[in-house]
């Protein structure tokens, strides 16, 4: 059955969307991305040190700034649009911004958390900071590009900013930060309106800078991720039949409902904007619930990690090594078949899972420039 897209082009698992044919009705000369580790292509690595091996091993052959064994959804989006992979704004080495820039960094929240990376594990590059980075990039890039030469080939053309696709995948860390701070799910729920308000303000600010095409992912089922499940003891009654923590998934759904409603309102106020709300929650949840039916061997267990029910240990992360009998060996080692795993390291999805998600949402890219 053909999918029926709402005025927001909301994409869900219930729509039987076929994989991308790479034939797009929309032409985007650039992508500007904002978010967290779900779409970070090297921002946090540039700021605080490279994510080491075995990250990147399934595709790049070496670490590539991504907390994944290979490509992220944003990489597949770039590929499908015929664009190069996005360089991280924070990465000064080997970057090319002619077709956009990536302002996402792992651990980034929408709201500033007023803590350091070492204190909380969350990035200081919140969404408002990412917007300031974009604002400065937008203005300075054209000044520098006017010098000609190599600058002209490494920076976007001025009209790329109004024709670009602006992508967002952020919000997960705002929810988990509250939970990790010993707040109840109910307490975190009361913060959702303010979180969404700040999210919408960022979009309005980008619109004010000429952005017109927005592609917004909702947040995933955090109650199915080992780093959240293992953080605190949960009552048996909190788990659903698939092993996920129901109250936390409900929290994510509450966030998504508020986000969708805010986008509906925003479309009426930003008359020239085309805003696509993308339901990745349903797709990710489908992978956790019916992993084997989609060619995966497991769902909750991490591919890369160490010990425990979920092959996850906060103190022994993916890629961690130690000296054994004079030799350096992996303790947080990867599984033999990452292409059969849903979760890479207890926090992030594998390249195979990202490809599954992308294939389902890809048809919406051909409509992401359409206003209704």
Curated annotation (Swiss-Prot):
The keyword GTP-binding does not apply. High expression in younger leaves and in the apical region of the inflorescence stem. CDD domains: SGNH_plant_lipase_like. The active site is at 37 (nucleophile), 345, 348. Its main location: secreted. Its EC number is 3.2.1.51. Residues 1-23 form the signal peptide. InterPro entries: GDSL, SGNH_hydro_sf, SGNH_plant_lipase-like. Glycans are attached at residues 96, 114, 139, 182. One of its GO terms (molecular function) is alpha-L-fucosidase activity. One of its GO terms (cellular component) is apoplast. The keyword Hydrolase applies. It is found in: Secreted, Extracellular space, Apoplast. Keywords: Apoplast, Glycoprotein, Glycosidase, Hydrolase, Secreted, Signal. Disulfide bonds: none annotated. It catalyses: an alpha-L-fucoside + H2O = L-fucose + an alcohol. Hydrolyzes alpha-1,2-linked fucose. Also active on fucosylated xyloglucan oligosaccharides. Belongs to the 'GDSL' lipolytic enzyme family. PANTHER family: ALPHA-L-FUCOSIDASE 3, ZINC FINGER FYVE DOMAIN CONTAINING PROTEIN. This is Alpha-L-fucosidase 3. It comes from Arabidopsis thaliana. The lineage of its organism: Eukaryota, Viridiplantae, Streptophyta, Embryophyta, Tracheophyta. The gene is FXG1.
């Amino acid at each position: 059955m053909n999918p029926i897209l709402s005025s927001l082009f909301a994409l869900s698992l219930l729509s039987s969307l076929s994989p991308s044919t790479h034939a797009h009705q929309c032409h985007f000369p650039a992508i500007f991305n904002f978010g967290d580790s779900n779409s970070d292509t090297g921002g946090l690595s540039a700021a605080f040190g490279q994510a080491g091996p075995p990250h990147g091993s399934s595709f790049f052959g070496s670490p590539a700034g991504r907390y994944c064994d290979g490509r992220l959804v944003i990489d597949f989006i770039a590929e499908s649009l015929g664009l190069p992979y996005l360089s991280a704004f924070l990465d000064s080495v080997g970057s090319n911004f002619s077709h956009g820039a990536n302002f996402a960094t792992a651990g980034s929240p929408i709201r500033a958390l007023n803590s350091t990376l070492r204190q909380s594990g969350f990035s200081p590059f919140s969404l408002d900071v990412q917007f300031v980075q974009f604002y400065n990039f937008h203005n300075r890039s054209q000044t520098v590009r006017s010098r000609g030469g190599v600058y002209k080939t490494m920076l976007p053309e001025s009209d790329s900013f109004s024709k670009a696709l602006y992508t967002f995948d952020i919000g997960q860390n705002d929810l988990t930060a509250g939970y990790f701070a010993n707040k109840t799910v109910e307490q975190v729920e009361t913060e959702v309106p303010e979180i969404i308000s700040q999210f919408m303000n960022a979009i309005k600010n980008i619109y004010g800078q000429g952005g017109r095409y927005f592609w917004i992912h909702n947040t995933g089922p955090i109650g199915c991720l080992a780093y959240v499940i293992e953080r605190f003891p949960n009552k048996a009654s909190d788990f659903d039949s698939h092993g996920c923590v129901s109250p936390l998934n409900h929290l994510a759904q509450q966030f998504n409902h508020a986000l969708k409603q805010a986008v509906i309102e925003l479309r009426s106020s930003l008359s020239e904007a085309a805003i696509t709300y993308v339901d990745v929650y349903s797709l990710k949840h489908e992978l956790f619930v019916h992993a084997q039916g989609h060619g995966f061997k497991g769902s909750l267990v991490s591919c890369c990690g160490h010990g425990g029910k979920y092959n996850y240990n906060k103190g022994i992360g993916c890629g961690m090594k130690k000296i054994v009998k004079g030799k350096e060996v992996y303790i947080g080692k990867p599984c033999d078949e990452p292409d059969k795993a849903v979760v890479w390291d207890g926090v992030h999805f594998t390249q195979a899972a990202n490809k599954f998600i992308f294939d389902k949402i890809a048809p919406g890219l051909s409509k992401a420039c359409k206003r209704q």
